[in-house]
């Protein structure tokens, strides 16, 4: 049995030293040291030895096992390093090669429309202002002629952070913040994200809006009509029929909804315009004196108008998109079309 152990050790040493891959090393380890390996087979014959021989053979068996395990570990380190060196050599990177440019994406259609709206109003003399999306109740409601318990608040389903803080339901709070900081004349648009508790094919809980307002001496409804008619003809094309309908907003008086001739059917009537030939596009009106009172503007000296529009709605009509939710699903097949 001693001779078998010595012979197995020599055979194992040669096998480990000649192995040149991790897979081969593992196969050799199992062959000699596994549960059904050669060492286990030899040790099964221990019962045939005399009591005096067993300790000697057992010690030799343990020595052989230890040496084979050390050979396996040492050769594994060597082979592992060789394989790593080979891999690094094969996967070498030539740092002198010219770099590859990242492929550029495209702007989101909502971003394109916001930029176009901004460009049009900038050419008309408007500057751009921004405000916080988490807004105080005062700026979102009270200063816009909607005090606590005012029935007009029911027109908008609001996300409340707490009793006095909300996710803004429109970008009109920017109008209040701007007028509190600047004396007339002011001519500003405020694009931004707004939030309302509504979700269907034409509404989402988060969408984009552009608020605009102008305050100066002797501003009339005719000025409002001229500005909006010019804007709509530039965004949708010349020759567009526009109409103003009387409406109600708590922060403007008089107020008007602005409709355009349906861009889908050219006024003939279709499913999109509900066979009316017209599409509601934005709300507008002359700024209410109560709003001027909130910002310490003299309504006897100054007058002004305000308007607001949903960017996604304009994008839907401009690009012929029939489902508002497509703008928020991040489908590359859809976005690549713009």
From Swiss-Prot:
Cofactor (UniProt): Mg(2+)
Catalysed reaction(s)? tRNA(Phe) + L-phenylalanine + ATP = L-phenylalanyl-tRNA(Phe) + AMP + diphosphate + H(+)
GO terms in the biological process aspect are:
phenylalanyl-tRNA aminoacylation
Instruction: Enumerate the subcellular locations listed in this protein's record, separating them with semicolons.
Output: Cytoplasm
Task: Name the principal localization, coarsely classed.
Answer: cytoplasm
Q: Top-level EC class, please?
A: ligase
Q: How is the cofactor bound?
A: Binds 2 magnesium ions per tetramer.
Return the GO cellular component terms, semicolon-separated: cytoplasm
* Residues at which Mg(2+) binds: 253
Per the UniProt entry, the Enzyme Commission number(s) are 6.1.1.20
Q: Which Pfam families match?
A: Phe_tRNA-synt_N, tRNA-synt_2d
What are the alphabetically sorted keywords of the record? Aminoacyl-tRNA synthetase, ATP-binding, Cytoplasm, Ligase, Magnesium, Metal-binding, Nucleotide-binding, Protein biosynthesis
Q: How does it assemble?
A: Tetramer of two alpha and two beta subunits.
- Recorded family membership: Belongs to the class-II aminoacyl-tRNA synthetase family. Phe-tRNA synthetase alpha subunit type 1 subfamily.
Q: Which HAMAP family match?
A: Phe_tRNA_synth_alpha1
Q: What is this protein called?
A: Phenylalanine--tRNA ligase alpha subunit
- Protein's organism: Syntrophotalea carbinolica (strain DSM 2380 / NBRC 103641 / GraBd1)
């Amino acid at each position: 049995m001693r001779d078998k152990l010595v012979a197995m050790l020599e055979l194992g040493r040669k096998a480990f030293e000649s192995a040149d891959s991790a897979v081969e090393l593992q196969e050799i380890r199992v062959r000699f040291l596994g549960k059904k390996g050669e060492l286990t087979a030899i040790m099964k014959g221990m019962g045939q030895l005399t009591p005096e021989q067993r300790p000697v053979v057992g010690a030799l068996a343990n020595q052989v096992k230890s040496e084979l395990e050390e050979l396996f570990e040492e050769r594994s380190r060597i082979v592992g390093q060789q394989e790593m060196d080979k891999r690094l050599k094969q996967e070498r990177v030539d740092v002198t090669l010219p770099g590859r440019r990242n492929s550029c994406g495209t702007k989101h259609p909502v971003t394109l429309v916001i930029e176009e709206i901004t460009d049009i109003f900038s050419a008309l003399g408007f500057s751009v202002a921004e405000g916080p999306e988490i807004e105080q109740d005062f700026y979102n409601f009270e200063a816009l002629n909607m005090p606590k318990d005012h029935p007009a608040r029911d027109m908008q389903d609001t996300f409340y952070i707490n009793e006095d803080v909300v996710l803004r339901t429109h970008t009109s709070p920017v109008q209040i913040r701007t007028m509190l900081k600047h004396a007339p004349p002011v001519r500003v648009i405020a694009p931004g994200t707004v939030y309302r508790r509504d979700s269907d094919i034409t509404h989402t809980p988060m969408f984009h809006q552009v608020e605009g307002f102008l305050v100066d001496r002797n501003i009339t409804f005719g000025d409002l009509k001229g500005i909006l008619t010019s804007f709509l003809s530039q965004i949708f094309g010349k020759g567009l029929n526009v109409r103003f309908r009387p409406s109600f907003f708590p922060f403007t008086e008089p107020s008007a909804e602005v409709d355009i001739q349906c861009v889908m059917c050219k006024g003939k009537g279709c499913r999109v315009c509900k066979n009316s030939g017209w599409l509601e596009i934005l709300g507008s009106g002359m700024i209410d004196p109560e709003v001027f009172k909130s910002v310490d503007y003299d309504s006897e000296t100054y007058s002004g108008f305000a308007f607001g529009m949903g960017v996604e709605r304009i994008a839907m009509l401009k690009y012929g998109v029939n489902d508002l939710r497509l703008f928020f699903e991040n489908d590359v097949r859809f976005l690549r079309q713009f």
